[in-house]
Amino acid sequence: METWRKGSFRNASFFKRITLGRPRRLHRQGSILSQASTAGGDHEEYSNREVIRELQGRPDGRRLPLWGDEHPRATLLAPPKPPRLYRESSSCPNILEPPASYTAGYSATLPSAISLTGPLHQCSEEALSDTPHFPRTPTPDLSDPFLSFKVDLGLSLLEEVLQILKEQFPSEPHF
């Protein structure tokens, strides 16, 4: 039971560490930064106030977001927009159409698809002439009484189909 209370959110010391530790940590960060700057080769001595002042406000007007800062996004300036490239401009290369030197160099080394189709069709025709032909399915006998089908078409489609059948088979009177 004791271990449960130690790591629980209900423990009062947990909230004290969160709320009361922030200002102290800020000062500790400033002292660590000042020690790191002297250890890194910059031989100037900085006090905690100077380091915090450098972190809060910089000469170019931008500010670094700090723990105690309420609106860190409002103080940061937006980065500059990149330049726009237009297709017609000379700064934008045309990547959709390859240059003439590229097409001339590669068209000479690679065969085209049209040049490959000739031998492909010749081989397939020779191979087909050697193989036996499969028997075709016989055409259905229209006078067979078991051959029947029904198609449900609308009136307009049915009239069009009958008109086409009359044009194709003018000698058949039963359409």
Swiss-Prot record:
The keyword Mitochondrion applies. It comes from the Eukaryota. Residues 29-48 are annotated as: Disordered. Keywords: Mitochondrion, Transit peptide. Pfam families: BORG_CEP. Residues 1-11 form a transit peptide. Coiled coil: none annotated. It is found in: Mitochondrion. GO terms for cellular component: mitochondrion. The keyword Mitochondrion applies. This is Uncharacterized protein C15orf62 homolog, mitochondrial. It comes from Mus musculus (Mouse).
